[in-house]
Amino acid sequence: MSTSRDRVRQALSHQGSDRIPVDFGATAVTGIHCRVVEALRKHYGLSYKPVKIVDTFQMLGEVDRDLADAMGVDCIGVGGTRDIFDHDTECMHEQVTPWGQKVLVPIQLDLTQDKEGDVYVYAGGDKNISFLILS
């Protein structure tokens, strides 16, 4: 049985392995929405905790080690210390999304919902620069 590292290296070298390497959540392309991450944790019987948002533009949740192990994931993400909106991802706080889910987001992040139900986020916490993230 190959290790995750072996599987990925063999795939990148176009060699066979015991199975195709699996990636859920290591990049913005393979990420999983925070609602789905919470549902997967419940499905696999993992302890409840607010999902850490790793991509605030797409609201992608962190696939942490216990969930990755449960799903047989081979790849792990290597994130930076700032998100796409220039928020510090080292300092997080709990916030409730407009759909009622508790998540961990950068402390500068302020999800604002307007009267039509659209949700906005602000670059670097600057209320003059807004981005629509949910309509």
Where are these regions (language model features)?
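Catalytic cores of TIM-barrel enzymes
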Residues: 1-135
